[in-house]
C-alpha cells in the first residue's frame, strides 16, 4: 500500500486503536526480517514484558530489549535523546506528552488497566471502612511512589485528593506524610528501596501500590495483606503505549499487545485487560 494511500485511510479512521491497527498491520505485512525492539516500560510491567518476549518474540521473529523505570523518568530519557521504539507507560500522560512533541508515529493507545491497593500488616486490621483513618493516624508512615517521575505516585495523590473531597485537609496531610517517607527512602541504597524491605525494616506501616503487584508482595511476606481501594476513591489507572519509531518489529509487538493473546498476558500478570480475552 502506497504511503499516500495509507495516509488517506488513516485520515478517515476515528480512534487511536483504529489508527494503530491499520498502520501496524501494514507494517507487519511488509516486514521480512527480524529486528530488535527497544522497549522502555514501567516497572509494574516487568512480568508483562517478560511474557511478551517469550510469547511474541518467537512468533513475530523479534527480540525484545527492555529497560524499566518510572514512566515519567523514561519519558524524560526519551526527551533527552535516548532511543526507544516503544514506551509502555503506567499512564496515558507520558505517551500524550510525547505525542504533543511530535515524537510518536500514531496516537497513544490504551492497553491495560490496574487498581490501587493499600498494603499493610495483617495485624493492623486495616479494612475498607477504616483505612483512611489509619493512614491519617499521626504515627502511621505511608509510602507511595514519587509523583511526576512515577505514575504510581500521581495515582496515589489523586486518591488523596478524592479523600479530601469529603474530608477537607486530609489530602494535604496524607501528601505530607508520604513525602516525608519518600525523602527518607531517597537516602537509602537503591537495592533496599522495595516495599518488602521497607516493611521488613519497619520503616513503613502502609503502602499505596498497584494491586497487580500485591500478590507477589504477600507471597514474599505472608504477614502482609492488601486491600483494594474502594471503587469510588480509586483513580482507576490506565496504561498506554507510545509508538516512537516506524520500526516494523515495534509495530508488530504493539499490535500483539492489543490482540487476544496480548490481552490474555495482561490478565495473567494480574492487570485488567481492556477487552475480555478469548480463552
Regions found by a protein language model. Name each.
Residues 35-67, 71-72, 76-82, 89-92, ...:
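Exported/periplasmic ABC-transporter solute-binding proteins
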Residues 7-9, 23, 50, 81:
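General helical structural elements
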